[in-house]
Amino acid sequence: MAGVTEGEDTKVIESKINELNIDKPKLEDNNEAKGNGNGNESGDDDDDDKEEDDDNEITEPSTSTASGDEKKKKNKNKKKKKKKIVSIDSSYPEGIFPEGQWMEYPLEDINSYRTTSEEKRYLDRQQNNKWQDFRKGAEIHRRVRHKAQSSIRPGMTMIEIANLIEDSVRNYSGNDHTLKAGIGFPTGLSLNHVAAHYTPNTGDKLILKKDDIMKVDIGVHVNGRICDSAFTMTFNEDGKYDTIMQAVKEATYTGIKESGIDVRLNDIGAAIQEVMESYEMEENGKTYPIKCIKNLNGHNIDDFVIHSGKSVPIIANGDMTKMEEGETFAIETFGSTGNGYVLPEGECSHYAMNKGVEHLKPPSERSKQLLETIKQNFGTLPWCRRYLERTGEEKYLFALNQLVRHGIVEEYPPIVDKRGSYTAQFEHTILLHPHKKEVVTKGDDY
């Protein structure tokens, strides 16, 4: 979730099998059973459920009886059963989840002792429960985005896409958006010049089109430990978005590489900017420089708080603040062919209760009741109107706006660059262990 600075011949045999009404053997997906090196288990093939296309099969002349023909017809009309998504815990009954990608810290002269220090390793083991929460969330994230990447197609409504992703998070986490585990923040599905913070409200009719470039920003939390990771999807076959996608992905990896204990935030931003702005995008004979969106940042993450104080710039901004041991950061970059600066525009869908507002009194009885619903279901985690409606809330907009005006709830409207421009995003969550950093959300896809 974006941090905002103020100011992705067998046919004949098959035919005979059908005639005899013999079930075809089902091949097991090895990934479902054991996953891959990054914990990318593909146990979510339930979205590949299609009716068998028997009309195009080659068949030999048959002397089957009428009853045989009837059986064949019934067989033909059968649909494959959908696999039900089950909680991730069933795959890891001992509660030990796949680790992310480990990386050495930069500043070798300062941090080389961390790799071999037994004391640092001991300190790391003391926080094992925390790391396992992040790894569980990251494994859910990988499975959910695998399902999204294999299922999302042009022609789907944004509501359909959001429900696909969010229901998968709920099912894999085994929770329906509770404070124990589930959705970490509203699913971002921002298109084209919209850079971040768009998710559909109920009744939104927006449809994904073939030429759209869509940022998919998914949050998963376990016990308040939020995994924040995003990718960009395109469906255009002429490759026009390849350059901006490559620029942003490479800039994000540069930010991850440069991050570490005692590293200054300005230095990370400068490295990101150098990579991002070395790219150009061509469209219709015109060349557009790819710019960092300078008022969007990465950010550190605290328990139940997605933006926790420190911002990781994607340009050199002079911030001499250092990253510290034990912190968690979302390293994200945004590239644009527009102005490289975003402004709020459009109907708001994202909200979050502010921290430290216990002393603020809701202005009405209805807003007080609404605030209780927010506290019980989301705490300080971000949420959207659709999630509020799942709790049973109706006719809440006036009360919600009262909470916003009184500073109890913060609103995060969509943020956009100039119309007609294109924006892209990639993001990973990193954990600053005492001895190494872990890119916990890393997968085979990005």
Swiss-Prot record:
Disulphide connectivity of cysteines: none
EC number: 3.4.11.18
Cellular localization per UniProt: Cytoplasm
Reaction catalysed by this enzyme: Release of N-terminal amino acids, preferentially methionine, from peptides and arylamides
Record field: compositional bias (Acidic residues): 42-58
Residues that, per the record, bind a divalent metal cation 1: D217, D228, E427
Any one GO MF annotation of this record: initiator methionyl aminopeptidase activity
Function: Cotranslationally removes the N-terminal methionine from nascent proteins. The N-terminal methionine is often cleaved when the second residue in the primary sequence is small and uncharged (Met-Ala-, Cys, Gly, Pro, Ser, Thr, or Val).
Family the entry assigns: Belongs to the peptidase M24A family. Methionine aminopeptidase eukaryotic type 2 subfamily.
Protein name from the UniProt record: Methionine aminopeptidase 2
Species assigned in the record: Candida albicans (strain SC5314 / ATCC MYA-2876)
